[in-house]
């Protein structure tokens, strides 16, 4: 085990605070509509230019071990806020730095750190309750666009794209972000259920212009095993042929004789069919097949349900208005499933989401809900260079998360004003002793910091703006983008309540832990290896090393 070094008391805290300040100073230059960019070096590929606070924080590793501990603790604030709310990482970092800075003064003056922390916690709890009171729900597409625009650092086109996507697929719908292939941003909306499996043979294509196999009013056969013997399929094929409608086969795999026969019949025009592999793997595959069955009003042909291919009838087959099968995706449009059954399935999956322990499982379950309840929208981010697309994509992701947070818990006036407005509720608090009251005062001062930083980044005098905003009430605040005072909600400067709340709670949590720290234990620096000799005596000054 490597030797450890221990630092105590003020020496430890001072180094930790230095680390906090180094990271926070790099992150906070990005805050607000006039925030600056940060360039991140990459060990390979182009440098990354970003205004995303958490992206900057994640890149920072300091050479000094103790400073690095402080920096990593604040990095945790940014990461946790990003995970919970998807945005507000820079605000959280600025708040954490302010609480640590103010708290350090009181600790150095001899106040009890534990009582300071109790005062901080009391003030934050009161601030959160007040935020909930001043929050109002998002009801219009315009408000959603405004929230997204603010989170995307004032880029209106991103806000409009996200609002349009939510309009099209609903609040439950899946919205994904991809690299575009043009200079402009694009929005693609897939209505109906889409899964990531394409045709098993290009001979199924009947729309060469779009390279798709398109089936109108088809039957849908769902099977959880491989199909290789055509004799298993013949009874179903004969019934479908008599009905005079096309057939989509979704199975674990279709191969050999069975696939060859389907292709030949398709080419001859005897029976229009398309075969695709079932999406997913293992238990997830079974669940997805069941989703498709419920959406199309069919049943999965599986041994577990006592159904076999040989005895399958048209009653067990699903139906849809139209199906489009590409090389990589299959889209089912307007399935014939009963709405009560679909709603019951959605409710069941939502219950599984509540019980899910891993983020991956939760994400996949939410995707299934969206596919059943709404649809899928894809925002394709355009740009002139790879660096520009990457930077813009980060902002679109932030804006998307902020929008979801706004839908969830509502909105408050942005630009740091909401935190100024909750000060009144905190100012009325009393602590159990002088030290706790000092903790409350720490939060009162820290709540001004996001507004101060937004104003400083805009090149204005922070103290004057803070005093003017504090003298106002309600939504009155400073719009840093225009340099004017007014009603921020009317002018579209909004923040999701969840983002502001999460940023404050996470900042106070980590800052409180830092203030109550009295020792650090870290790996001792290794001694430098002895220098190599410049050459070998008698080698004529050749400088060769051996």
Curated annotation (Swiss-Prot):
Example GO BP: protein refolding
Reactions catalysed, as given in the entry: ATP + H2O + a folded polypeptide = ADP + phosphate + an unfolded polypeptide
Domain of life: Bacteria
Listed HAMAP family: CH60
Binding site for ATP: 30-33, 51, 87-91, 415, 479-481, 495
InterPro entries xrefs: Chaperonin_Cpn60_CS, Cpn60/GroEL, Cpn60/GroEL/TCP-1, GroEL-like_apical_dom_sf, GROEL-like_equatorial_sf, TCP-1-like_intermed_sf
Annotated keywords: ATP-binding, Chaperone, Cytoplasm, Isomerase, Nucleotide-binding
Species of the source: Burkholderia thailandensis (strain ATCC 700388 / DSM 13276 / CCUG 48851 / CIP 106301 / E264)
Gene Ontology CC: cytoplasm
Entry function: Together with its co-chaperonin GroES, plays an essential role in assisting protein folding. The GroEL-GroES system forms a nano-cage that allows encapsulation of the non-native substrate proteins and provides a physical environment optimized to promote and accelerate protein folding.
EC number(s) recorded for this UniProt protein: 5.6.1.7
Biased composition (Gly residues): 537-546
One MF annotation (Gene Ontology) recorded for this entry: ATP-dependent protein folding chaperone
UniProt enzyme class: isomerase
Compartments where located: Cytoplasm
Protein's name in the database: Chaperonin GroEL 2
Assembly and oligomerization: Forms a cylinder of 14 subunits composed of two heptameric rings stacked back-to-back. Interacts with the co-chaperonin GroES.
PROSITE patterns noted in UniProt: CHAPERONINS_CPN60
Region (Disordered): 524-546
Protein family according to the UniProt entry: Belongs to the chaperonin (HSP60) family.
Pfam families: Cpn60_TCP1 (PF00118)
